[in-house]
From Swiss-Prot:
Expression sites (tissue/organ): Detected only in mature female parasites.
Ranges where the record places region Disordered: 155-212
Signal sequence coordinates: 1-27
Biased composition (Gly residues): 163-205
Organism for this UniProt entry: Schistosoma japonicum (Blood fluke)
Name the record gives this protein: Eggshell protein 1
Keywords from the named record: Repeat, Signal
């Protein structure tokens, strides 16, 4: 009888270890939304002696997967660095997955919006700001003495507009309180070769935290 109770006790402990009850420390919120797309077509540099341009930044990654503490926060920079301060294209930061591990909190957001492009066909700088819109940077002139603030020949060549932002990703799937919502459309001006589609949201955790 005593040995049977001992075995039953050990079996109960083993089951608890293998299938722990939901708690505040092993609960997910649901994954974050995907990142925005990249920027548009940018000029290589500032000034009338510049031409063409590279592509804008890439879109941010999807939100982290749910799990212990949820999916973690995605890198909100996403593609925001697409297009250099001289209007060059460059490739944006494509991070944003979040960690999804036991040291992360919440479902988190996915990557940010894509960066804007530079000037079309040269002219001013016009790299991206953190909202994916082009701006008139202070390197709008060229090395031949044109106005460095883009007010003479730089402005004549046209200030570049930010590339078209991409679509936000889908929300996280299931778990916890459900997935977070995807980000909205990326902000930015016209420009050719608009950004790509945002990443998918991460998968949610299994349980909703009791304090949520």
């Amino acid at each position: 009888m005593k040995s049977s109770l001992t075995l039953l006790f050990l079996a109960a402990i083993g089951y608890t270890i293998a299938y722990p009850p939901p708690s505040d420390y092993d609960s997910g919120y649901g994954g974050g939304g995907g990142g925005g797309g990249g920027g548009g077509y940018g000029g290589w540099c500032g000034g009338s002696d510049c031409y063409g341009g590279g592509n804008g930044g890439g879109g941010g990654g999807g939100g982290g997967n749910g799990g212990e503490y949820g999916g973690g926060y995605g890198d909100v920079y996403g593609g925001s660095y697409g297009g250099g301060s001289y209007g060059g294209g460059g490739y944006g930061d494509v991070y944003g997955g979040g960690c999804g591990g036991p040291d992360c909190y919440g479902g988190g957001n996915g990557g940010g919006n894509g960066g804007g492009g530079g000037c079309n066909g040269g002219g001013c700088g016009g790299g991206p700001d953190f909202y994916g819109k082009g701006y008139e940077d202070s390197y709008g002139g060229d090395s031949y003495g044109n106005d460095y603030y883009g007010d003479s020949n730089g402005r004549k060549n046209g200030h570049g507009k930010g590339g078209k932002g991409g679509n936000g990703g889908g929300g996280g799937k299931g778990g916890g309180k459900g997935g977070g919502n995807g980000k909205g459309n990326g902000k930015g001006g016209g420009g050719k070769n608009g950004g790509g589609k945002g990443g998918n949201g991460g998968k949610g955790g299994s349980y909703a935290p009791s304090y949520y």
